[in-house]
A protein has these predicted regions:
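Short, basic/aromatic recognition patches that contact phosphate-bearing ligands
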Residues: 1-57
Length: 57
């Protein structure tokens, strides 16, 4: 899966779910590392996508 496809997939997953979604869940579903998810989230935020999160407790 290319990065653009993965970014779109992340957005679709986040919109479809009503509760919290962890980076670990996204990584597992998209078959990438957690670090890749963090980089992708950062790219989406830099592109102006309003994403908000909290550190896991």
């Amino acid at each position: 899966m290319r990065r653009t496809e993965r970014l779109f997939a992340i957005l679709q997953i986040l919109r479809a779910r009503t509760g919290a979604v962890t980076a670990e869940q996204l990584a597992s579903e998209l078959e990438v590392s957690v670090r890749t998810i963090y980089r992708d989230i950062e790219a989406l935020q830099l592109a102006g996508v309003p994403l908000y999160g909290e550190p896991a407790s």
